[in-house]
């Protein structure tokens, strides 16, 4: 892995979820700067608006809850904002300004629906933890999700396999971004819930031919 990226090279951490869902969707949003909203994205944004309150923190049952925490990893080349970071008193933790003792951090990601079948949520949460680890020089073994639809909290172990996967995806994202390349993908059922279906036009992708082949056909037909 590239040892370190510059500030100008950092990609949005939120793009990891788009990339896992569909590489083409990610490229349309982050390379071509396309964006469309559907019911799912609007509901998700409303939930995050309730969570996001910059620089706000509270203490309950000995746990310090910080909201909208900016994070970055120059090793992964990612930056973003954690919905919530919980700091629990620990002898092996970090010191916080204005607080006595040391605390262990853990990211908590708020989600609109229920647990997904793919690994996109896990990748995003793990990336947040990796950013915090790099910034605070501490190991973070677990993170958590709170699923709004089912009012349920789920803890996630941040395994070596998951950490390696985040690194691989980050590298692939940077490779596409540096080339300015929007990949083609096979249409699937997931396309129906994609906020960019009208921009992507997945049903037409199989009909698209490379420009070089089109020119060659015109020469042969002429």
Located regions from the model:
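Cysteine-cluster motifs in flexible loop/terminal segments that predominantly coordinate metals
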Residues: 22, 181-222
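Metal-dependent nuclease catalytic cores that hydrolyze phosphodiester bonds in DNA/RNA
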Residues: 1-107, 207, 217-222
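A short hydrophobic/aromatic micro-motif that marks alpha-helical segments and, especially, helix-coil
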Residues: 37-39, 176-177, 212
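A general structural signal for stabilizing positions within well-ordered secondary structure
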Residues: 75-76, 134, 185
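Short, intrinsically disordered, charge-biased short linear motifs at domain edges
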Residues: 6-9, 172-188
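Glycine-rich, flexible loop/turn motifs
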Residues: 6-7, 15, 152, 181, ...
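Nucleic-acid nuclease catalytic cores
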Residues: 79-80, 86-180, 192, 196-198
């Amino acid at each position: 892995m590239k040892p370190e990226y510059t500030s100008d090279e950092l990609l949005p951490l939120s793009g990891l979820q788009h990339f896992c869902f569909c590489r083409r969707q990610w490229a349309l949003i982050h390379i071509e700067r396309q964006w469309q909203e559907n019911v799912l994205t609007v509901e998700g944004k409303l939930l995050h608006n309730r969570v996001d309150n910059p620089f706000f923190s509270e203490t309950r049952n000995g746990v310090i809850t910080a909201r909208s925490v900016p994070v970055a990893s120059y090793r992964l080349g990612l930056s973003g904002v954690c919905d919530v970071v919980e700091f629990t008193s620990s002898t092996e933790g970090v010191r916080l300004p204005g607080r006595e003792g040391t605390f262990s951090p853990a990211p908590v990601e708020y989600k609109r629906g229920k647990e997904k079948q793919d690994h996109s949520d896990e990748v995003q949460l793990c990336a947040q933890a990796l950013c915090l680890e790099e910034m605070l020089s501490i190991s973070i073994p677990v993170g958590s999700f709170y699923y709004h639809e089912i009012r349920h909290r789920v803890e996630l172990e941040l395994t070596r396999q998951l950490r390696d996967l985040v690194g691989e995806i980050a590298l692939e994202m940077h490779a596409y971004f540096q080339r300015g390349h929007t990949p083609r993908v096979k249409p699937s059922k997931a396309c129906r819930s994609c906020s960019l279906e009208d921009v992507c036009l997945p049903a037409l992708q199989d009909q698209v031919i490379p420009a070089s082949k089109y020119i060659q056909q015109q020469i042969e037909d002429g």
